[in-house]
Amino acid sequence: MKDVRSLTELVFNHIQQMPRSDKRKLIAIGGAPASGKSTLASQIQMRLEEEGYPCGLVPMDGFHLDNEILVERGLLDRKGAPETFDIAGFVNLINRLSAEKELTVPLFDRGRDCVIEDAGRIKAQHQHVIIEGNYLFLNDGVWKDLHSCWNLSVFISPPQNILKERLIQRWLDNGLDETAAKARALVNDIPNGKLILSKINRQIIDVWLE
């Protein structure tokens, strides 16, 4: 896989080729857990702003259901799976991005493992907004309703061995021992990534990064 700088330039070039209009453009970046979505999204945001294009950012992680709700539903061990997100709230926010100039968005605090409401802002000058998340292109259920919202669809797909290494390291960095870190990666995160690849609507992807 190319380095993040090369990937950023590739996506930036696609953005520059998009038809000009006064309407806000929604750029969707999807991929499996630990695929590099967040890093790529932040780099593209910076690149756009360097060129004078104000850009907002909406991470789908801000729509994780609260742990208390997941416990009640018996889903805490599956956190990160499609059914553990507030999909109705997420779809509502995506629709608001096209209808409203300014709004706040929730952000996920990984260290505290919780969502912080209204922690992010989309401003009127943000003519480009990047949305990044696991299930943006899932060809299943309500997720399909999102496909027509995207002006540019980007999917990042590193090799499985790289995903595994990154996921284990992520859990180690969050304080788990090696056994627990491997279990979290193998039992939940990697299956979620395989689900994404098996149910993705490839026909709507404009840029596929490997």
Please report, for each region that a protein language model flagged, where it lies by residue:
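Hydrophobic positions on the alpha1 helix immediately C-terminal to the Walker A/P-loop
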Residues: 40
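Small-molecule kinase domains that catalyze NTP-dependent phosphoryl transfer to phosphate-bearing small molecules
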Residues: 116-118, 141-144, 169-210
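Extreme N-terminal, non-catalytic leader segments
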Residues: 1-28
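Short beta-strand-centered segment that lines the nucleotide-binding/catalytic pocket of NTP-utilizing
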Residues: 51-68
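Walker A (P-loop) phosphate-binding loop of P-loop NTPases
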Residues: 34
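Conserved lysine of the Walker
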Residues: 37
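Conserved nucleotide-sensing/catalytic segment adjacent to the nucleotide-binding pocket
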Residues: 56, 68-112
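ATP-dependent NMP and nucleoside kinases share a basic, alpha-helical "lid"
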Residues: 112-170
